[in-house]
UniProtKB/Swiss-Prot annotation:
Cited InterPro entries: Exonuc_VII_S (IPR003761), Exonuc_VII_ssu_sf (IPR037004)
Pfam families: Exonuc_VII_S (PF02609)
Organism for this UniProt entry: Bacillus licheniformis (strain ATCC 14580 / DSM 13 / JCM 2505 / CCUG 7422 / NBRC 12200 / NCIMB 9375 / NCTC 10341 / NRRL NRS-1264 / Gibson 46)
Keyword Transcription regulation: no
Catalytic activity: Exonucleolytic cleavage in either 5'- to 3'- or 3'- to 5'-direction to yield nucleoside 5'-phosphates
Main location: cytoplasm
Similarity section: Belongs to the XseB family.
SUPFAM superfamilies: XseB-like (SSF116842)
Lineage: Bacteria, Bacillati, Bacillota, Bacilli, Bacillales
Top-level enzyme category: hydrolase
Name the UniProt record assigns to this protein: Exodeoxyribonuclease 7 small subunit
Subunit structure and binding partners: Heterooligomer composed of large and small subunits.
Amino acid sequence: MAEENKTNRDDLTFEEAMKGLEQIVSKLEEGDVPLEKAIDYFQEGMALSKICHEKLQNVEKQMDFILRENGELAPFSVREEEKGDR
């Protein structure tokens, strides 16, 4: 059954994983959760957190590239204005 949950988690979108993580945090913040159940929630929360982190890293990698005028992918970097550039 744990393997089934792992498979189901892999199919989650970022938003679904975040919602699940928020629900777990809410349950744990209530404080009336038995220790064994709290550990289960914590483990599930860590798995959801990992999914969110991996999805964010993937998006970050995608955003490192933008299309050039000729259609090739190029690294993208944001240059902050320096004080003297005004």
